[in-house]
């Protein structure tokens, strides 16, 4: 399922209150100021929707499924706050660009341009991107953050930011879980085989970072939330850097 905020499908992307089910953080802990200075919350028509990462003063990276097919005018982002409902700086969008090869769950990234510039400083910073062509190493630790649901099918989403650390899962293992064709080289997987820790509805588009706090991916999709033997699936920044660099 996708991981924006809503409940409809079981295998799709991860956003908030929409026609597809999207993940929140399951099995996580509260984030502290400064943990993710580049994270933004994305609301749609005033309600929780997705997450994203601030790349510079005018640009946010999120999942394509968070914005594809929806009116640009309905979106607002909030930066510089652990709360998705107050504090920080807000901006509407001036433009949306979805990856030109976005299809199904593949190439699931979009670039959002902001109507209001957001300077760095205080609790706000810009994401450091994984190198072009890089691929997260299986077994290494990664941390994902968001305001999504804390359980699969959960009807409420947290106001304050949560985070959870999970290991990178090899592409071979992830393909065994989902099927060879479902997991492309533009994706990577992370999760605990026993379940209990994952992104969930409402976390879509939000950041997953490596141990150096480098942005390696965006929350994309999965089979439910935190189920045993089903990893969370992420759009790969390293594999999709050319798109990001062209439009950021």
UniProtKB/Swiss-Prot annotation:
One of its GO terms (cellular component) is extracellular region. GO terms for molecular function: serine-type endopeptidase activity. The active site is at residues 65, 108, 204. It is found in: Secreted. Keywords: Disulfide bond, Hydrolase, Protease, Secreted, Serine protease, Signal, Zymogen. Residues 25-248 form the Peptidase S1 domain. Disulfide bonds join 50-66, 174-189, 200-225. The record marks 198 as: Required for specificity. Its EC number is 3.4.21.4. GO terms for biological process: proteolysis. Residues 18-24 form a propeptide. This is Trypsin. It comes from Fusarium oxysporum (Fusarium vascular wilt).
């Amino acid at each position: 399922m996708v991981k924006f905020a809503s409940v409809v499908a079981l295998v799709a992307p991860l956003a908030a209150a929409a026609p597809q089910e999207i993940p929140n953080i399951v099995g996580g802990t509260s984030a502290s100021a400064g943990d993710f200075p580049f994270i933004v919350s994305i609301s749609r028509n005033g309600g929780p929707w997705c997450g994203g990462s601030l790349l510079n003063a005018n640009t946010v990276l999120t999942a394509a499924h968070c914005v594809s097919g929806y009116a640009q005018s309905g979106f607002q982002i909030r930066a510089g706050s652990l709360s998705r409902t107050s504090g920080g700086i807000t901006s509407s969008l001036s433009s949306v660009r979805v990856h030109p090869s976005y299809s199904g769950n593949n190439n699931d990234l979009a670039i959002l341009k902001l109507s209001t510039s957001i300077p760095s400083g205080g609790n706000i910073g810009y994401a450091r991107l994984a190198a072009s062509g890089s691929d997260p190493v299986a077994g290494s630790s990664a941390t994902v953050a968001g305001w999504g649901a804390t359980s699969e099918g959960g009807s409420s989403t947290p106001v304050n930011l949560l985070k959870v650390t999970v290991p990178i899962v090899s592409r071979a293992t992830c393909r065994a879980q989902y099927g060879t064709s479902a997991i492309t080289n533009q994706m990577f997987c992370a999760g605990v085989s026993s379940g209990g820790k994952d992104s969930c509805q409402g976390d879509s588009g939000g950041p997953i970072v490596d141990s150096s706090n480098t942005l390696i991916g965006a929350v994309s999709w999965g089979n439910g939330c935190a189920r045993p033997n089903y990893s969370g699936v992420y759009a790969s920044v390293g594999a999709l850097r050319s798109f990001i660099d062209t439009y950021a």
